[in-house]
Amino acid sequence: MPFMTASSPSLLQRLKSLSLVTQILIGLIAGIALALFAPEAAKGTAFIGKVFVSALKAVAPILVFVLVMASIANHKHGQETHIRPILFLYLLGTFAAAVVAVIASMMFPSHLVLSTDNIAVSAPGGISEVLQSLLLSVVDNPVSALMNANFIGILAWAIGMGVAIRHAGDTTREVLGDLSNGVTVIVRVVIRFAPLGIFGLVASTLATSGFGALIGYAHLLAVLLGCMLFVALVMNPLIVFWKLRRNPYPLTLQCLRESGITAFFTRSSAANIPVNLELSKRLGLHEDTYSVSIPLGATINMAGAAITITVLSLAAVHTLGIAVDIPTAILLSVVAAICACGASGVAGGSLLLIPLACSLFGIPSEIAMQVVAVGFIIGVLQDSAETALNSSTDVLFTAAACLGEEQKAQRPA
């Protein structure tokens, strides 16, 4: 039969020939369909999602350690990196996100029905405690840092070892480069399983949680997600345009599509580091720069966390009828930005830093912790959107700074 030739591609071959983003989209649609039509079967797919997230989390610490160490060890004298402008963009973006959240919360105030149930969690006592936590993370034992995915400690040791090995022989540096390439190959294999992992995560999450619990907090969620969308689609492109002086949307949308989607479903900036490193490589960015800025961004570039802290804190303020003047709102933006930068150093992330911001308005800890409880209830969407914004912004600002510096170097003197 002439139409049944050996050259006809099978369904599996056709799927393999599609881009990773398209495969992820198919996995996403399949996960939603399974949760809708066979919820019991969908619950069983949770294991696939857990395996994928665990694999990403397992490979991320060693990848960052080896990649940064190899990058610094093989860095040639006189070769430029663009870390300083990226750091500036990270801080500017986080502060801008906090300002957007303050304005949105003033325009569309949210009111909460605060629960009387107390959650037994411990929040940091002040900004100094968050900063102390970060400093202690820097001087953490290297083995402990790798085991616990303490990326501040991993970065500190990788930079220190890289600087020390720069003075070693060429053979040592070549071995380190080969080791880095080997880890990168493993990462690529893990990322190829993203469509299956996201299928499992989406199907099991929708089947077990659903979105019924979120209906009561629709207004609060609308403000939170609206702020995050505004920052992702308006504020960040404005910052990129200021840096590149050209249409920022092709780059912005590529970062959201290829980094934001996986981050949304894994809900982990650390797990998304390998995805961002791979995207940076495909964009042709400076390896010595992105190998440091991407893991650093996963720790301190927290626009989504700044929005969460600000919106939920001001929701508590509006609920209690506390008046907020402009200077206090500006101070809240600064505090939220600083807290957000320390969110990765606190177990529970941005939600447990809400009492710290609430303390600006004299809100007692008991009430602030009830606001944290609300945060946990809406966490299905809030945490996913926050991580997607945080992680996609890491690679967006890295690309903007690298491309901007390249443009500057090419301009005639």
Swiss-Prot record:
Highest taxon listed in the record's lineage = Bacteria
Assign the protein's first listed, main location to one coarse class: membrane
Catalytic activity, reaction form: L-serine(in) + Na(+)(in) = L-serine(out) + Na(+)(out); L-threonine(in) + Na(+)(in) = L-threonine(out) + Na(+)(out)
**Membrane topology annotation:** Multi-pass membrane protein
Q: Write down the InterPro entries for this protein, in alphabetical order.
A: Na-dicarboxylate_symporter, Na:dicarbo_symporter_sf, Ser_Thr_transp_SstT
Q: Which Pfam families match?
A: SDF (PF00375)
Membrane-crossing segments per the record: 18-38, 52-72, 86-106, 119-139, 145-165, 196-216, 221-241, 292-312, 320-340, 360-380
Q: Which family does it belong to?
A: Belongs to the dicarboxylate/amino acid:cation symporter (DAACS) (TC 2.A.23) family.
Its recorded name reads Serine/threonine transporter SstT
